[in-house]
Amino acid sequence: MSSSAVFADNAGHESPNFPLRVVDGLTLPPEYRKALRPGEEWKDATGRGRQLPRYFYEIPSWDSAMKIELASHFLLWEFIQVDVREAPPLRTFPRYVPCAITLLAVCLERFREAVGTMVHISANGGYRSPSHRFSKNATLHSWGTAGNIYRIGDTFLDNRSAIERFSLIARETLPGIWTRPYGAPSGFAEDHLHLDLGYVLSVPRDVTN
């Protein structure tokens, strides 16, 4: 049996405090591999190749997603809200999210502490697969390391003043965070605050290959 197969069989036992099973994307059924493209290269807007995540958390049900905390004030469901633009296999359960999603949750928790109020992630603004209709140019959302925030407390982020104010707080609070500038052209944002951690690949410690 290959080392990756052994890992898949034993997945879920290396993190006793976290309830989700880790899976090797290369061992998933064909329809999931086609949608997730685990470990494949995807070119960004500059033509540079970026390696897609290979290891994922398996979410068994929406009920599980509604209950599992990724951080003190963030539940898993907030990061996986998608609509019909997502690939059909990934609109039902089980669902799969890159392991790096936990890093994004920790950063958003720290950001929430800095702003002192609730932080709301947009629909289609957390994880979305490479097959999602919004996904292009190696979007960081397909790594699970980007979040689009549409509202903070009672403030909707639909104007320059609000977006730039909270963007500054994010950059001052989170070392290495990147935020989209305000504006309408591609690469800008005018109706949300985009935060991302870059192309992070999270590989579980028990992987041997």
Regions found by a protein language model. Give the residues of each.
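N-terminal start-of-chain detector that recognizes signal peptides
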Residues: 93-96, 118-124, 164-170
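Extended, low-complexity, intrinsically disordered C-terminal regulatory tails
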Residues: 103-136
